[in-house]
């Protein structure tokens, strides 16, 4: 049987993920300084380095046994995986934001049930947010530079992730509402959890010292 295979996200929570795995005694430090290499073997463990949005895909379909990913990705994709531990790192917020000079106008439009255009990288999250309020929105999916959309007239507002709010402030965007909060989570493939129960439970016990158990 191959070694335990772990999917690690590139980007903002990459270092947090490595620290959590290293704290669990895994040789995750081997992933540092390896440039574009996306598959690693070290100490009997296999690591996949992928885009955050792809981590749940690898885990759900069994290409990885476990993975680390932000709660925002899980809420957007709703994958069929086990969510084991809230690692508490990589904290950020999903927010509704609009240009500062038009913020009150957008708030009034939403309050009066007018259809607003919303740009986002999280279309399911955005639709769910407006549906739960009983409001309608035209959701425009983008894959980057969401902050630009209301500045050039593509949308009235955005739904996006922010950690410090710096990018929003730099683009004169004001937060209208906080939709949810996100931290890094340890997830597992359901089949792997049964077949590799001892390995995954051992990992869970180690990383769980720094995190909070959640439902699967």
From Swiss-Prot:
Its main location: cytoplasm. One of its GO terms (biological process) is L-histidine biosynthetic process. Catalyzes the condensation of ATP and 5-phosphoribose 1-diphosphate to form N'-(5'-phosphoribosyl)-ATP (PR-ATP). Has a crucial role in the pathway because the rate of histidine biosynthesis seems to be controlled primarily by regulation of HisG enzymatic activity. It catalyses: 1-(5-phospho-beta-D-ribosyl)-ATP + diphosphate = 5-phospho-alpha-D-ribose 1-diphosphate + ATP. It comes from the Bacteria. It comes from Rubrobacter xylanophilus (strain DSM 9941 / JCM 11954 / NBRC 16129 / PRD-1). One of its GO terms (molecular function) is ATP binding. GO terms for cellular component: cytoplasm. Keywords: Amino-acid biosynthesis, ATP-binding, Cytoplasm, Glycosyltransferase, Histidine biosynthesis, Nucleotide-binding, Transferase. Belongs to the ATP phosphoribosyltransferase family. Short subfamily. Its EC number is 2.4.2.17. This is ATP phosphoribosyltransferase. The keyword Nucleotide-binding applies.
């Amino acid at each position: 049987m191959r070694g335990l295979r772990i999917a690690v996200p590139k980007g903002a929570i990459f270092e947090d993920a490595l620290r959590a795995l290293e704290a669990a005694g895994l040789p995750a430090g081997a992933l540092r300084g390896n440039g574009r290499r996306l598959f690693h073997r070290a100490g009997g463990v296999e690591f996949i380095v992928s885009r955050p949005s792809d981590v749940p895909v690898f885990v759900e379909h069994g290409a990885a046994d476990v993975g680390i990913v932000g709660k925002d990705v899980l809420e957007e994709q709703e994958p069929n995986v086990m969510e084991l531990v809230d690692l508490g790192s990589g904290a950020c917020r999903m927010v509704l934001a609009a240009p500062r000079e038009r913020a009150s106008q957008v708030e009034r439009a939403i309050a009066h049930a007018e259809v607003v255009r919303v740009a986002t990288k999280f279309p399911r999250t955005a639709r769910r947010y407006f549906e739960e309020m009983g409001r309608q929105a035209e959701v425009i999916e983008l894959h980057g530079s969401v902050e630009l959309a209301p500045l050039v007239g593509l949308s009235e507002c955005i739904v996006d992730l922010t950690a410090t709010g710096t990018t929003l402030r730099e683009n004169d965007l004001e937060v209208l509402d906080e939709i949810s909060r996100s931290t890094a989570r340890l997830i597992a493939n359901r089949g792997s959890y049964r077949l590799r129960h001892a390995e995954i439970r051992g990992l869970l016990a180690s990383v769980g010292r720094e995190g909070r158990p959640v439902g699967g």
